[in-house]
């Protein structure tokens, strides 16, 4: 099963993914993959990191000072996706009960290797929980085993409970 969480910027996608990760880990499931938290400097968003959930390794994904392909005002470090994110996701495919990818969006998709790896995950039997940028969603939601949830601040808790129910019904869970 693939659970994709989408919504407007600031709607709570990453918070939802984090709550689901905590729930699964609390139930004894192993979780791997990546998160991409923002980096703030002086109260302003300066960039984004990529963090390997299993090892805690981190690297700079994008910043206002990074050279590389641009997404808005951020330069993207494609190398960190290839060297840190892709191995983290591939390892999670082999070793973990659930893969977390937060987020599948324009910055992350600048890496061809990351795109290939996401396609592999989508074609696998592994449970995936991912935050997905709205514009990216259209190209990947056509698969039968994909469940898409739209998060907004008003119905965030209701969506969380629906996903928990779905996970409880998922026959691949222990």
Swiss-Prot record:
InterPro entries: Nuc-triphosphatase_THEP1, P-loop_NTPase. The keyword Secreted does not apply. Keywords: ATP-binding, Hydrolase, Nucleotide-binding. SUPFAM superfamilies: P-loop containing nucleoside triphosphate hydrolases. It comes from the Archaea. GO terms for molecular function: ATP binding; ribonucleoside triphosphate phosphatase activity. It catalyses: a ribonucleoside 5'-triphosphate + H2O = a ribonucleoside 5'-diphosphate + phosphate + H(+). Its EC number is 3.6.1.15. It is an enzyme of class 3 (hydrolase). ATP binds at residues 7-14, 98-105. CDD domains: RecA-like_Thep1. NCBIfam families: PRK13695.1 (NF010248). Belongs to the THEP1 NTPase family. Has nucleotide phosphatase activity towards ATP, GTP, CTP, TTP and UTP. May hydrolyze nucleoside diphosphates with lower efficiency. This is Nucleoside-triphosphatase THEP1. It comes from Methanothermobacter thermautotrophicus (strain ATCC 29096 / DSM 1053 / JCM 10044 / NBRC 100330 / Delta H) (Methanobacterium thermoautotrophicum).
């Amino acid at each position: 099963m693939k659970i994709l969480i989408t919504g407007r910027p600031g709607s709570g996608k990453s918070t939802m993914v984090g709550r689901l990760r905590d729930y699964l880990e609390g139930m004894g499931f192993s979780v791997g993959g990546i998160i991409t938290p923002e980096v703030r400097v002086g109260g302003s968003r300066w960039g984004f990191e990529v963090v390997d959930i299993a090892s805690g390794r981190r690297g700079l994904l994008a910043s206002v000072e990074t050279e590389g392909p641009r997404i808005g005002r951020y330069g993207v470090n494609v190398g960190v996706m290839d060297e840190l994110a892709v191995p983290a996701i591939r390892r999670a495919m082999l070793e973990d009960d659930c893969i977390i990818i937060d987020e599948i969006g324009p910055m992350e998709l600048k890496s061809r290797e990351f795109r290939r790896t996401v396609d592999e995950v989508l074609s696998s039997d592994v449970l995936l929980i991912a935050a997905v940028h709205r514009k990216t969603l259209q190209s990947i939601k056509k698969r039968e085993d994909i469940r898409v949830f739209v998060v907004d601040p008003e119905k965030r808790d209701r969506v969380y409970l629906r996903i928990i129910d779905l996970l409880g019904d998922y026959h691949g869970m222990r």
